[in-house]
Design a protein with these regions (language model features):
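Interfacial loop/helix-cap signal at membrane boundaries in integral membrane proteins
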Residues: 1-14, 128-137, 178-180
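Alpha-helical transmembrane segments and, especially, the helix-loop junctions at the ends
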Residues: 62-81, 93-159
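Long, contiguous bundles of hydrophobic transmembrane helices that form the permeation core
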Residues: 147-180
Length: 180
């Protein structure tokens, strides 16, 4: 009986996480269908008048939405795509900006689905709580920190793109994004 009980407890936690992600996706769909994303996109399109400002806004929005990395990708992508298209930021660059802020921000934010998952794996040996261990580990998350720094560095630098990203950005600036 104890094996069955243990399996149910473990599966219950995974089911809750799956339900959480599904509900976040549904929330994004409702916001999009209700016109919330389009309204924000229209407002932002009037305020953001350059590729640099559109990229920076994408990075900042990506850092503000730290509850879940999937929610971050759904929301930032839906909201910022029309703004970055208008300002001739390539879809490849938009995808990079979203991806490079989604998980890195979630893994260093104490209030996120990632934090809940990491904290649940920490053994309860009495030396410190899972939250204390998580908070102490934040400065050691160099990938996450450097990824976020790199996003803003690439947004600010005029010639920051290289390789295929530079080619995609050049194509977007010369041909626009009207065919996407």
């Amino acid at each position: 009986m104890s094996i069955v009980k243990g399996l149910i407890e473990k599966m219950g936690g995974n089911a809750a996480l799956l339900l959480f992600v599904v509900l976040l996706g549904a929330l994004v769909a409702v916001i999009t269908k209700a016109g919330g994303s389009a309204a924000y996109g229209s407002w932002a399109a009037g305020k953001l008048r350059s590729g640099t400002s559109a990229q920076l806004a994408t990075g900042f929005l990506g850092c503000l939405i730290f509850i879940d990395d999937y929610f971050n990708c759904f929301t930032v992508g839906t909201v910022m795509r029309p703004v970055t298209d208008k300002n001739k930021v390539s879809r490849e660059k938009l995808a990079y900006l979203i991806d490079a802020t989604a998980a890195p921000v979630c893994i260093i934010a104490p209030i996120s689905s990632w934090a809940a998952s990491v904290i649940s794996y920490y053994p309860t040996d009495g030396t410190m709580t899972g939250m204390q261990a998580f908070l102490r580990a934040i400065p050691m998350n160099l990938y996450a920190i450097l990824s976020i720094v790199m996003v803003f560095w690439l947004c600010i630098r005029k010639k920051g793109d290289f390789g295929p990203m530079a080619a995609a950005q050049r194509r977007a600036e010369e041909q626009g994004l009207q065919n996407l």
